[in-house]
A protein has these predicted regions:
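Extended, subdomain-level signal for the structured scaffold at the beginning of enzyme domains
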Residues: 1-96, 105-107, 125-126, 133-136, ...
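A short beta-strand/loop micro-motif in the catalytic core of glycosyltransferases
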Residues: 96-97, 117
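A conserved active-site-flanking secondary-structure segment within enzyme catalytic domains
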Residues: 112-139
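Short FAD-binding loop at a beta-strand-to-alpha-helix junction that anchors the flavin cofactor
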Residues: 144
C-alpha cells in the first residue's frame, strides 16, 4: 500500500499522525511525504516537524492521497501549483482523503465541485465558496473521495481504508 501525504507549514500534526497510525496498525504502507519543496516542514504544534522527500513538481500513482488541514490550508489553496498538484495526484490515486480544512484544497482542485463534503465547521463558508456543499456529517464519501471533519473522523475512515485498498472491499 502506497500513501502520499501533502504536508505544509502550519499543518495540524494530529491530522497526519492519527490516520497514519491507524493505517499502520493494519498494514505496513510505504509513505511518501510531499511539500512545496523537499525538506523540513513545520507543523502547527510546537516541536512537530515533517521531512518532505519530494516537492510538488512530481506526481506519482498512489493508493491514498492524504490531505490534512491546518492553519496553512487557505494559503495552500491559493497556490495554483499546489492546487494543480492535488488535482493531478488525485487523478492517479485510488482513494483521496482530506482531514478538516484539507477539504479546502480538494475543493480548490475541483474534486468537490457540486458535491457534499465534510470539513472543519469554521471553514464551511470557504468550502462553499469553493464550490462544495458543506455538511455537518463527520465523514462524507463521494466515490473514491472521502472528506472528514477532523482527526477523530479520519481515524475511523483510516480503519477501513486498508481493507478497501488491499482487498477491494466495498464501503
Amino acid at each position: 500500500m502506497h500513501i502520499t501525504v501533502l504536508v505544509f507549514n502550519g499543518v495540524t500534526s494530529r491530522e497526519v499522525v492519527l490516520p497514519l497510525t491507524v493505517i499502520c496498525d493494519a498494514v505496513n504502507p510505504t509513505v511518501r511525504w510531499v511539500a512545496l519543496q523537499p525538506g523540513p516542514v513545520h507543523g502547527f504544534e510546537p516541536l512537530q516537524r515533517f521531512e518532505a522527500e519530494a516537492g510538488i513538481d512530481t506526481v506519482e500513482p498512489t493508493d491514498l492521497l492524504l490531505v490534512p488541514g491546518g492553519l496553512g490550508s487557505v494559503r495552500m489553496m491559493e497556490n495554483p501549483e499546489v492546487v494543480s498538484w492535488v488535482a493531478a495526484t488525485a487523478a492517479e490515486a485510488r482513494f483521496v482523503m482530506s482531514v478538516s480544512t484539507g477539504s479546502l484544497l480538494l475543493a480548490a482542485a475541483g474534486l468537490l465541485a457540486d458535491r457534499d463534503a465534510s470539513g472543519h465547521w469554521l471553514a464551511s463558508g470557504v468550502l462553499e465558496a469553493a464550490g462544495a456543499h458543506p455538511t455537518e456529517e463527520p465523514v462524507t464519501w463521494q466515490g473514491n473521495v472521502v472528506t472528514t471533519a477532523g482527526a477523530a473522523a479520519a481515524a475511523d475512515v483510516a480503519a477501513e481504508l486498508p481493507r478497501r485498498i488491499e482487498y477491494g472491499a466495498p464501503g
